[in-house]
């Protein structure tokens, strides 16, 4: 089948750098299905690349001057491509435990071609046991001399690169017949495809991704490496939404800033003019490709795209670029500076290199130091699947049984050819990272029976649309909570999507897995064994201290402020939806649960909106509605704060109060602080209660403002003694809990306005009187 630009990388089969669309990208990796080819380079000079039609691309990483003492050497490299020799990488330093195929469990086939396969694997031995990786397995016998060189070059480059925005090589090893590369498994998918399908983003959002990409190029160039294959398929998202540059099969090493390479390679639409005309290219070629990516991100279109490849190349060499009028002056300026056909005049080609690009006005608001340290949150977090999910891969491959078949050695000296190939990353021994646990979105949830993997235990809760049970995973005997939602009565898609993106937050309930059958959705969540927040007070039969209450409120505000910053409103922050994960009720184990009524900000076309997009392009009435939802979250926490401090609710006097009575008190907006208990509470606490319960949502503090309030900020210095029980009296906390629930129910069931005939409205009656009076006056005048 033919592919078109914009098709998800998953359908191409590879989200970590082996794209079946350009076989050259796969030359050190996988030559996937020929009918999946999309980007094909044209060659007329057989010295540039092999003329074999099954291997239409050649390596693009070019090293421009190897750093001194870098542990490898390149022998007899000639930049005119007239001759090539093998690369001796025997001097690469190895550290830590040596890996071999027996240490990896094969989980799925991710791709397959004439060179070998790509597997999803899990490490089953060693300190990083349990980690999931992508494993390229290459058959030595099928690798031509040029392919062997590129394979070792890719391994060589990746072994010496450690950068937050570049894919990491963890191990490289070989058997007599095969080569193995163990890489990051990136589950976030292709950045541009994901964003174009899921989220509305703006020029400010583009700055973030382009800045991270610029830092990646800066690092490569500092090592003397020209990337030469910058395109959307090679820029992927990690679990947090940061980019990772992948696929170094087309990169080239060992040229300095004044030398050039003459290879014709890459993807035509992203090629610089000097690559097409074969006059030699340097690192500046990457900056042209950066401009193409920037243009595509901002407009959704390629800057140069003809009827066919030849026409596209002609446009790149000669056509005048049409600059969209809606781009800012800074964006247009940067694009023009990157699209200089004379590479010597191109921004970044000067003596300061990438620094010239970083100093451009387009990036004026970007703090590159914080960005490099990942101290700036990405504008978009992908909805991730389980740690070993392959939902973004071609099912043609993933449905196959993973099997690493034996291979004959390439030749009698096959092992010697790849001498020094083995490698173990330093980080493998030094870092012990937790595996992120999240889940598939509902459309791709697991469809095998939930009871195949879990045993359902006792019921622990229920709601209007769902029931919650304890459950136990059969394989590990670990206990979870399973929320079962009937599809016929409630659509859980939004709830699952929100938890996929945000359950990593410390104070949001963790979502581990999702199952789906014909009648229900099964959400496997963290089991909160500490129970409800107010149950703790019920059991204590006394109030906590201000210090304890402030710690609880700080954590809740932290979670709500995060959700609001991500364009999510919970809209159901009742006391029953705030639980403790641990039995000891430590405030650090607080969890906000039940996102059934939560909402994400979406554009009219259903796509998610980043904060920048929301602020710039959303209608005022939509913003007011979003602000109202978020303000209600703060109000709900204000009710809870009042109750925890005083032992009574602000608007319900007892369990027998009617909704109308409660709503009347809420509408009055009067909060009495005359009870003796308030005499024992600090003025700062009283001030925060008033601000969170302000009847006017426009005056009410936001979650961020509440989190910055003085009372929260000085929580460690607050009194640690319980609020005096003699002032409160004997607490019936069960009645307090019921009264609090009545308050939330009253708000949720606030009666809607009863519509009556138009003629019965006061305005209609007044106008009718005016008409009757006018007619009366007219008749009187006529009779006179």
UniProtKB/Swiss-Prot annotation:
In the Enzyme Commission scheme, what number(s) does this protein have? 2.7.11.1
Residues recorded as bearing Phosphothreonine in the entry: 401, 610
Alphabetically, the GO molecular function entries are: ATP binding; magnesium ion binding; protein serine kinase activity; ribosomal protein S6 kinase activity
- One family name in Pfam for this protein: Pkinase_C
Arranged from A to Z, the UniProt key words for this protein are: ATP-binding, Kinase, Nucleotide-binding, Phosphoprotein, Repeat, Serine/threonine-protein kinase, Transferase
Domain named Protein kinase: residues: 104-363, 454-712
Q: What is this protein called?
A: Putative ribosomal protein S6 kinase alpha-1
What organism is listed for this UniProt entry? Caenorhabditis elegans
Q: In the UniProt record, what gene is named as encoding this protein?
A: rskn-1
């Amino acid at each position: 089948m033919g592919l078109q630009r914009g098709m998800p990388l998953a359908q191409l089969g590879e989200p970590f750098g082996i794209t079946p669309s350009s076989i050259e990208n796969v030359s050190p990796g996988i030559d996937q299905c020929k009918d999946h080819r999309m980007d094909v380079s044209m060659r007329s000079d057989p010295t540039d690349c092999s003329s074999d039609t099954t291997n239409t691309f050649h390596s693009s990483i070019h090293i421009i001057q190897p750093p001194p003492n870098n542990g490898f050497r390149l022998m007899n490299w000639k930049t005119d491509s007239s001759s090539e020799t093998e690369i001796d990488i025997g001097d690469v330093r190895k550290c830590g435990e040596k890996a071999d195929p027996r240490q990896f469990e094969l989980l799925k086939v991710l791709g397959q071609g004439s060179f070998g396969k790509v597997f999803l694997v899990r490490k089953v031995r060693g300190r990083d046991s349990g980690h999931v990786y992508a494993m390229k397995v290459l058959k030595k016998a099928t690798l031509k001399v040029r392919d062997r060189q590129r394979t070792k070059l890719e391994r060589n480059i990746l072994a010496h690169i450690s950068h937050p925005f570049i894919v990491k090589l963890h191990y490289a090893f070989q058997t007599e017949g095969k080569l193995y590369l163990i890489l990051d498994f990136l589950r976030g998918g292709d950045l541009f495809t994901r964003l174009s399908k899921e989220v509305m983003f703006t020029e400010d959002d583009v700055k973030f991704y382009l800045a991270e990409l610029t830092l990646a190029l800066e690092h490569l160039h500092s090592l003397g490496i020209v990337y030469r294959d910058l395109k959307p398929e090679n820029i992927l998202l990690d679990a947090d939404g940061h980019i990772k540059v992948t696929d170094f099969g087309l990169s080239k090493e060992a040229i300095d800033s004044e030398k050039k390479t003459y290879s014709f390679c890459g993807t035509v639409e992203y090629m610089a003019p000097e690559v097409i005309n074969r006059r030699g290219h340097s690192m500046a070629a990457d900056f042209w490709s950066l401009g193409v990516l920037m243009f595509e991100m901002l407009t959704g279109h390629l800057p140069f795209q003809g009827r066919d490849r030849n026409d596209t190349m002609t446009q790149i060499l000669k056509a005048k670029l049409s600059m969209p009028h809606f781009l800012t002056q800074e964006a247009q300026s940067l694009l023009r500076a990157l699209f200089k056909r004379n590479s010597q005049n191109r921004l970044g080609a000067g003596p300061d290199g990438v620094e010239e690009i970083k100093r451009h006005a387009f990036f004026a608001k970007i703090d590159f130091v914080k960005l490099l340290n990942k101290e700036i949150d990405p504008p978009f977090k992908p909805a991730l699947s389980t740690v070993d999910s392959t939902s973004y891969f071609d099912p043609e491959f993933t449905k196959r049984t993973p099997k690493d078949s034996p291979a004959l050695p390439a030749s009698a000296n096959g092992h010697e050819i790849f001498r020094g190939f083995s490698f173990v990353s330093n980080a493998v021994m030094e870092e012990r990272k937790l595996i992120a646990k999240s889940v598939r979105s509902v459309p791709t949830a697991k469809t095998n029976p939930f009871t195949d993997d879990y045993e359902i235990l006792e019921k622990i809760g229920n709601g209007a649309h769902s029931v919650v049970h304890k459950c136990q995973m059969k394989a590990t005997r670990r206990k979870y909570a399973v929320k079962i939602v009937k599809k016929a009565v409630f659509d859980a898609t939004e709830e699952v999507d929100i938890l996929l993106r945000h359950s990593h937050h410390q104070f949001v309930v963790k979502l581990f897995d999702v199952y789906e059958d014909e009648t229900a959705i099964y959400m496997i969540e963290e089991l909160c064994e500490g129970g409800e927040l107010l149950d703790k007070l019920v059991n204590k039969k006394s109030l906590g201290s201000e210090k304890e209450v402030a710690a609880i409120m700080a954590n809740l505000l932290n979670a709500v402020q995060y959700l609001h910053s991500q364009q999510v409103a919970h809209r159901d922050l009742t006391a029953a939806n705030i639980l403790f994960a641990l039995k000891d009720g430590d405030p650090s184990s607080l969890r906000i649960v039940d996102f059934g009524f939560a909402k994400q900000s979406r554009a009219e076309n259903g796509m998610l909106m980043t904060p920048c997009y929301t602020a710039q392009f959303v209608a005022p009435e939509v913003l007011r509605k979003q602000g109202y939802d978020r303000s209600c979250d703060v109000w709900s926490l204000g009710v809870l704060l009042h109750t925890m401090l005083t032992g009574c609710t602000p608007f319900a006097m007892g369990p027998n109060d009617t909704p109308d009575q409660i709503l009347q008190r809420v509408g009055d907006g009067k909060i009495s602080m005359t009870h003796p208990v308030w005499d024992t509470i600090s003025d700062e606490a009283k001030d925060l209660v008033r601000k969170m319960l302000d009847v006017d949502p426009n005056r009410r503090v936001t979650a961020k403002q509440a989190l910055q309030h003085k009372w929260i900020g000085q929580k460690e210095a607050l009194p640690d003694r319980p609020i005096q029980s003699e002032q409160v009296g004997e607490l019936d906390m069960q009645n307090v809990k019921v009264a609090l629930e009545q308050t939330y129910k009253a708000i949720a069931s606030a009666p809607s306005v009863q519509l009556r005939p138009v003629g019965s409205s006061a305005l209609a009656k007044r106008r009718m009187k005016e008409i009757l009076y006018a007619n009366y006056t007219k008749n009187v005048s006529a009779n006179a």
